[in-house]
Amino acid sequence: MGSIPSEKETIFRSKLPDIYVPDHLPLHSYCFQNLHQFSDRPCLIDGFTNKTLTYAEVELASKRVGAGLHRLGLRQGHVVMLLLPNSIEFVLSFIGASLLGAMSTTANPFYTSAEIHKQAAAAGAKIIVTESCHVSKLQGLEGISRIVVIDDAVRVPENVMHFSELESTDEAELPRIDVHPDDVVALPYSSGTTGLPKGVMLTHNGLVTSVAQQVDGENPNLHFSEDDVLLCVLPLFHIYSLNSVLLCGLRAGAAIVLMRKFEIVRLMELVEKYRVTIAPFVPPIVVEMVKNEAVDRYDLSSIRVVMSGAAPMGKELENKLREKLPNAKLGQGYGMTEAGPVLSMCLAFAKEPFEVKSGSCGTVVRNAELKIIDPETGFSLSRNQPGEICIRGNQIMKGYLNNPEATKQTIDEEGWLHTGDIGFVDDDDEIFIVDRLKELIKYKGFQVAPAELEAMLITHPNMADAAVVSIKDDSCGELPVAFIVRSNGSEITEDEIKKYISKQVVFYKRIHRVFFIEAIPKAPSGKILRKELRARLAAECPNGRQL
């Protein structure tokens, strides 16, 4: 990489001192540990219906839902799939499963039937909680004992019941479960640094540690309090929102306003109505905020913090947002699902804030270690030298579900998780991301694994070979594009290929451009040489962007 690696490891730690982490507690006990301080304060607010539950009501309802899930046969170590938008029912189901020592695997409700079936089967889900409009996509699923819907449906199959039946269960039926800190509580799916989606095993200890790294201590890195109102517009099936919004909010005793989906005008109405103070966003939402003229018609002065994550945010976009929200502290965090997910957080969000640089994604979280290595040699690099970012700490995943080989490729023998991201740490301990080793495409913060799309493409009889890479896009970040080798005599068109894929995948995985090519460039090992394809793409498309 143009730098001389050092055999002596340079390890970076937070500027803030390490803290005590009550990692003996199950996640649900940890989140409600300070319940007595804010039991009567609002906890969950449905941004669509305005229904509000206090902290005491959420704890009680979670116990009832847990008892209801137990009555349906959910046991310790079992998996429930939450195929839901942001909703009170999502939160109650997640906590209810945790109380039973069960795991929640979260899935995007916009997934196609095939995508849902793959994840449910791989995770070994026993029960699915969803909306009635998605029940038709669940037909033929093996191993599912019951489907629970959160809305009133006119007609549902026999094995479908309403969520209200869970809520009406006597909480006394909830069994006492001995939950071990190393037990898995969350099972999100991620493509990791490469390849197909895999179940990421996040334990009670791991998530307790991750939340504590952010919001606990005398000078928390992420200063939330019971006086704060958090806007939960990012989907809870994504680990960023589940961890840094929901779990951190619960731990701090803040009110959490749940938005089922992103609509810019409704978002501003909720900010004004509930005096939202904390706004966790992703760059595409920031783009809407700065471009939409309606923003100026609403009072958004209550926002004191804008957190951005899931994808990098450019300096120009940052500056435009500062003009719209002059009262807000703006900063970025950095993470990946396998890391628990938060690796670093902007110290401008601390109770006693630090000055931070534009473009930085913060400093490494407390009670963790970070190093930068030369990807070729594995040797540690010092400050201001770009290399692969590695993280170590109790917050990282236990491993990939039923995939020890992929786990070994991601977490080394010394416990370092290799992110596949290229970055450097400057003289002030701030982390900057400069490139990606991993092949994932980031569409508005969502992961798109090229290998998943390639596997679909090459099953088509008119395609001999295929490769998928990304192209930059101003509003979406990155878009998937395909390079295709036609089968002999085939005249398959770009439009036919796009339609073939769009029928099988969720909207953000759709192919946006198709380029026909004589052969896919590959190394002797058979690995696709994506750099060559990106170079060709740069020649085809001015500025490397969508035409």
Curated annotation (Swiss-Prot):
Keyword Cell division appears in the UniProt entry: no
Signal peptide limits: none
Pathway(s) where this gene product acts: Phytoalexin biosynthesis; 3,4',5-trihydroxystilbene biosynthesis; 3,4',5-trihydroxystilbene from trans-4-coumarate: step 1/2
Stretches assigned to coiled coil: none
Keyword Zinc: no
Region SBD2, annotated ranges: 333-400
Reactions mediated catalytically: (E)-4-coumarate + ATP + CoA = (E)-4-coumaroyl-CoA + AMP + diphosphate
GO terms for biological process, alphabetical: phenylpropanoid metabolic process
One GO MF term: ATP binding
EC number in record: 6.2.1.12
Residue sites binding ATP per the record: 190-194, 238, 310-312, 332-333, 337, 421, 436, 527
Name of one Pfam family that matches: AMP-binding_C
Region (SBD1): 263-332
Highest rank taxon of the organism: Eukaryota
Keyword annotations of the record: ATP-binding, Ligase, Nucleotide-binding, Phenylpropanoid metabolism
InterPro entries assigned: AMP-bd_C, AMP-bd_C_sf, AMP-binding_CS, AMP-dep_synth/lig_dom, ANL_N_sf
Organs and tissues of expression: Mostly expressed in stems, and, to a lower extent, in bulbs.
Entry note about domains: Both substrate-binding domains (SBD1 and SBD2) are involved in the substrate recognition, and are sufficient to confer the substrate specificity.
Record-stated family: Belongs to the ATP-dependent AMP-binding enzyme family.
Function: Produces CoA thioesters of a variety of hydroxy- and methoxy-substituted cinnamic acids, which are used to synthesize several phenylpropanoid-derived compounds, including anthocyanins, flavonoids, isoflavonoids, coumarins, lignin, suberin and wall-bound phenolics.
Name of the protein in its database record: 4-coumarate-CoA ligase 1
